[in-house]
Amino acid sequence: MITLLSTGSNAHGQLGNNTLDDSHIFQPCSFINHPPNSLPPGTSALLSVVSGANHTLVLLELVDQLGLKKTELWGCGDGRAGQLGKIYREESFAGSSTAKFRKIELFLEENGLPGYSYRLISASWETSYAVLSCSGKGDVVISMGSDEFGDLGIGGFARIEKSEKDFHVVKFDHLSTPSSIHNALRVESITSGQRHTIVHLQISESANIPPLLVGWGTSRHGQLGQLSSLSNSKPPPFISLPRIIALEDVVSSALGIHHSLFLHASGQMSALGSNRKGQLQLSPSKSVRAIGCTWNGSYAVVESNEGWRIYSSGSNSHGQLGLKANPLNADIPNSGIVHFPEILDSKSTSIEIACGSEHILVLSRDNIKEDRFVQQVSKFWGWGWNEHGNLGTGNTDDTLLPLKIWSNESGFISYLKGVDELTGIWAGAGTSWICCLHNDDT
C-alpha cells in the first residue's frame, strides 16, 4: 500500500496528519473523505510534494477502471492568502479542517483551459504554482496566493484587481520569442525558493530557438541575474513579470532565499545571488549529478571514483553542512564534503537528495549481487536543523552528521516501523515527507 508520511512543523495543519501539533516522528497523512493512512483510491503514484511557509501541495497520479491515467492536486495547511485556491480558502473560513488533505478544485475548463491537466507543481512562501499540459497545445503556468514580492509573476496586477480569481496565468509572450510559437512551449521544470521562482522553457525544436531560463520574484541580491544593461546598477528588490536569465544548457535549478544554483548539461554548476553565508563556494567543477539548496546553503551530488560525494557550503548554524570538522557558526562561511559513516558506491548505488529550510534528506539505493540474485538495499539519511522534529527521530535535537533514519538492511533498527520501501523524499520549511510502501497490518 502506498502511504505518504510527514513529520515536523505543523501549526496550520501543513503535515496533513489530522492534527495541529508538531510531529517528531513520521506519521501517515490523511485525505478527507478517504480511509485513514491511505491515499485516494486508484492512486498509482505520488508524483510530487511541495510546501511553503505553512501550506502543502501534493500531485497524485490516478488510474481509473478503464486504465486511463489522470492527475489530481491536493492541499492542506494555511490557505488564507489564496495559495490553495479560492474554494479551499472559503471552506476553511467556513470551518473545514486544514489538517487533512483536500482536493484542490480550480475549474480549469470554466477558466478557459479545457483538456488541461496538472503536470508539475512548485511553492514559495505563500504562493503556489502548477504547470498544466494538454495534448497538441503549449504548456500553461498558473499561480495563486500572495503577490507581495511579485510572486504571482503577473506584473503586480493582483493588487489592483477588484475581483478574486481562482488562479492567475503567468504569461511569457512579452519575452523575445515569436508570439506564434507560444503554443509550442513546454515547461521542463519549475523551481521556487522562499520568494523567487525560476522556470525552464523548452520551445519546439522546429522553431530553432534555444531553451529559455526565466524567473521572477525577489531579485535584490542578484538571484535572478543581471537585470539591467548597466553592470554597475543595483538589481531591483523584485520583478513581477518573468525575465530571461542569461544562462545556457541548464538542466536543473535549486533556489534558496537569496541565491540560485544551476546544474548544466556538462556536469558543471553556476550560481547567482548572495554569497554572504558562503553559499556560492561549492568546490566541485565537474561530474555533478544533482544539486540542492537550503535557505542559506548549497549542495552538489558528485560522482567520483571514491563513490558518491555530497559537497556543501554556506550556513552551518545547525550542522546542516554535515561536515566532520563542524564549527557551528552561521557567520563563518564553511564548505566541504558531507561526512557519511559509510561509503556510497556510485557504481551500484543511486542517490536522491532533498533540501529543506535548514535540513537535508538523502535516499540511497544500492543493488547488491548475491549469487544469481540482485537485492536492492535502501538507506534513508537526514541531518541538520531539527527544532520541530522534522528529521523524524523522535526528538528535537539538531543532527550534525548524516544519521541513518531507515534502511531495509537485515537487522537494522529503524526510526520508521512497518515500512517496506521508500519511493520518494521531500523537505520543506521545518517539514519532511516520504512516500513509502507500507505494511497493511501496521
Feature locations, PLM:
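Flexible extramembrane linkers and terminal tails adjacent to transmembrane helices
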Residues: 288, 346-348
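Short, well-ordered alpha-helix to beta-strand connector turns
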Residues: 250, 286-288
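Extracytoplasmic/lumenal low-complexity Ser/Thr/Pro-rich segments of cell-envelope proteins
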Residues: 237-239
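Periodic beta-strand elements of RCC1/NHL beta-propellers and select beta-solenoids
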Residues: 1-35, 40-53, 58-125, 130-192, ...
